[in-house]
Curated annotation (Swiss-Prot):
Residue ranges annotated as motif Histidine box-2: 272-276
Residue ranges annotated for the Cytochrome b5 heme-binding domain, each copy included: 1-75
Record organism: Komagataella phaffii (strain GS115 / ATCC 20864) (Yeast)
Segments crossing the lipid bilayer: 215-235, 248-268, 329-346, 360-380, 393-413
Protein name per its UniProtKB record: Delta 8-(E)-sphingolipid desaturase
Motif (Histidine box-3): 455-459
EC numbers for this chain: 1.14.19.18
Length: 542
């Protein structure tokens, strides 16, 4: 049975989680609670052709099971609907609000507005009409004004967003993916993990040796570096890219993340899966939602409702003060990042936000045991070995400050990149390359970055073992040359410079917005509103 686009809209409107895979209409109502990747990952794909995403994130055996959820066929090519969680327009008059929230991710009393409405294809010409810039006096429009300029710049730098061009990009991406599979790049090089084991074991031995020798600063640095390196293996395990066995890789990840590192692998996976699907979207991607401390998009300056955290991110007085100097506070705040991860990890497990049913459900209890074990061996046993409260305090700070390195590495790949919503026509491959950068470094130094230097490649092929990223890089570069997509790569210093500059740009918008709010009624000697005059003097940095 072939189902039309409007019929699909009606089926979703009856409270069904409908996703398009190839030419099949999948009803995932019965899978939401069991999906190991979390229900929100599915919510963001409702009404869309998710073929590229589903093939990229799942192993071949899992891919074979997709069509068992099929309830019909659709005619290809499919024009994406906007998912309900992203503000799609559906009629839910006869559906219970609890069903809508559970199955579709819609929040009662909250209205999400997509930047680009359904059936709109952004072009340079249409963007100037749909996303006007300039001549504003209302302080609320400063957010849209700044963001619209960035959207316009993005449109000029990528291939056309029309359906045919984006479908061709998808086809070429799938050809590239098949080439990578055929060349055996999904085979994990376990010799590289033996090297990782030796390196991390050495850091652990140094931690113990220095601790017993009462060289507490060196001991703290050693364990901090060990945690930094362990994060990369936990990341690999979370993507099932070590053994490609779901249970084994998750157990490896939990031992490393929870038992040794004190962080929840389940929390990270739930967060990270959404991040991969809606990368750098200010409303939906939790990886760039850090108010009141950071904002990398002016869209976060307007009390945005986070569909991930299910709450408003308030642009309150604290945020208004902090964001004006965020580029100056960037590194100091990142140095305390691990403490926030402890909070998020415990909250995730205590509140039971991970899968409650299916093969991933039991991980919650193993993770809780892991966090308790970590608290015992680090916060109790290790700290009790240090004689004074002052030394314990500094040991705690130095060990956690050392892990700031990995926080810088994580955000480097995305903070400086596009945060624009270009509409539902943009393909998976276009979005990933537009919102992600790689970091240039010599091959011998790859271990230090742990694969995070190839985040653009990782976002295209999430299950690919990281030790093969460098082998795949020439293929991705050639692909980008052939398609007109841009492969962004910068040195570590230059990349950090772009991040800080991006944050300074947004900080300048906060200053302007605050000036507007305080002086909207005052006029300067030219008769212009002070806010309007200042807007004219500010230009967006490239």
């Amino acid at each position: 049975m072939v189902v039309s686009r409007e019929e699909v809209r009606e089926i979703i409107g009856r409270g069904n989680a409908i996703v398009i895979y190839e030419d099949h209409l999948l009803n995932l109502n019965g899978w939401l609670e069991r999906h190991p990747g979390g229900e929100k990952a599915i919510h963001h794909m409702i009404g869309r052709d998710a073929s590229d995403e589903m093939n990229a994130y799942h192993d071949p055996e899992t891919v074979k099971t997709f069509k068992r959820w099929s309830i019909g066929r659709v005619k290809l090519p499919w024009d994406n609907l906007v998912p309900p969680i992203q503000g799609g327009n559906y009629s839910f008059d006869k559906v219970d609000q609890r069903v809508i929230y559970k199955k579709l991710g819609i929040f009662p009393g909250v209205k999400i507005e997509p930047k680009v409405q359904e059936n709109i294809v952004l072009t340079e010409k249409s963007a100037s009409k749909l996303l006007p810039v300039g001549g504003v006096r209302d302080p609320k429009t400063i957010i849209e004004d700044f963001d619209n300029k960035l959207v316009y710049e993005d449109i000029k730098q990528i291939p056309s967003l029309d359906h045919e061009t984006q479908r061709n990009l998808s086809l070429q991406y799938n050809e590239l993916h098949q080439t990578i599979i055929n060349r055996g790049y999904y085979q994990c090089d376990y010799w590289q993990y033996f090297k990782e084991f030796c390196r991390i074991s050495s850091l652990f031995l140094l931690f113990v040796l220095f601790l017993r020798s009462k060289w507490y600063t060196l001991s703290a640095i050693s364990i901090g570096l060990m945690w930094q390196q362990l994060v990369f293996i936990a990341h690999d395990a979370g993507h099932i890219s070590i053994t490609h066995n779901y249970q084994i890789d998750n157990i490896i990840g939990i031992i490393i993340a929870n038992f040794i590192g004190g962080l929840s692998l389940g929390w990270w996976k739930r967060n990270h899966n959404v991040h991969h699907l809606v990368t750098n979207d200010p409303v939906h991607d939790p990886d760039i939602q850090h108010l009141p401390f950071f904002a990398v998009s002016s869209r976060l300056l307007g009390n945005v409702f986070s569909t991930y955290y299910e709450k408003y991110l308030w642009f309150d007085k604290i945020a208004q003060k902090m964001l004006q100097i965020q580029h100056k506070l960037y590194y100091p705040i990142l140095s305390f990042g691990r403490f926030n991860l402890y909070r998020l990890s415990w909250s995730h497990l205590i509140m039971g936000l991970g899968p409650r049913k299916g093969k991933a459900a039991w991980f919650r209890y193993l993770e809780l045991i892991g966090l308790c074990f970590f608290s015992y061996w680090f916060f109790y046993k290790t700290m009790s070995y240090i004689p004074t409260k002052t030394l314990r305090f500094w040991f705690l700070l130095i060990s956690h400050w050392t892990t700031m390195i990995v926080h810088v590495q994580i955000v480097l790949s995305h903070f400086a990149m596009s945060t624009s919503d270009l509409g539902s026509t943009e393909s998976f491959v276009s979005r990933q390359l537009r919102t992600t950068m790689d970091v240039d470094c010599p091959e011998w130094f790859d271990f230090f970055h742990g694969g995070l230097q190839f985040q653009a490649i990782h976002h295209l092929f999430p299950r690919l073992p990281r030790h093969n990223f460098r082998k795949v890089q020439p293929l991705v570069i050639e692909f980008c040359k052939n398609t007109g997509l841009h492969y962004s790569i910068y040195g570590f210093v230059d990349g950090n410079g772009k991040v800080v500059n991006k944050m300074a740009d947004v900080a300048s918008q906060v200053v302007i917005l605050n000036d507007c709010l305080h002086s909207i009624h005052l006029e300067n000697t030219t008769g212009k509103n002070l806010y309007e005059a200042k807007v004219e003097s500010v230009s967006i940095k490239g």
